[in-house]
């Protein structure tokens, strides 16, 4: 499952950068605080991203991602993806997840 997590983290960071290239800016929801990414699309009747203070990356769909990847252990009904995103002090994007056996899965770009 960690291989799948690594692939998902790469998909997210690639989509964010493609969005930034096309729009000359990062999605505004990304802050300097590492925050869990919202599982967009699992519930369209209530904006649970803001209720649960999760990062809403719906601006990436459908042009950059068909849907936001979620951890393989997460259910479709979970509000969060178990993947986290933030800008570091140098302005780079960090996308990370928690792997099995305590492994940290992270890409900084």
What are these regions (language model features)?
Residues 9-12, 16, 57-60, 64-68, ...:
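Generic hydrophobic secondary-structure signal
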Residues 1-7:
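Amphipathic alpha-helical segments typified by the pilin-like N-terminal helix
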Residues 25-29, 47, 56, 108:
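Short, solvent-exposed coil/turn linker segments
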């Amino acid at each position: 499952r960690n291989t799948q997590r690594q692939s998902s983290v790469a998909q997210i960071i690639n989509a964010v950068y493609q969005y930034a290239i096309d729009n000359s800016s990062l999605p505004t929801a990304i802050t300097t605080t590492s925050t869990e990414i919202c599982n967009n699309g699992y519930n369209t009747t209530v904006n649970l991203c803001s209720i649960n203070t999760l990062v809403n990356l719906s601006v990436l769909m459908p042009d950059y991602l068909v849907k936001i990847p979620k951890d393989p252990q997460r259910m479709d009904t979970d509000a969060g993806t178990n993947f986290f995103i933030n800008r570091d002090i140098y302005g780079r994007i960090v996308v990370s997840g928690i792997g099995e056996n305590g492994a940290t899965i992270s890409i900084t770009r």
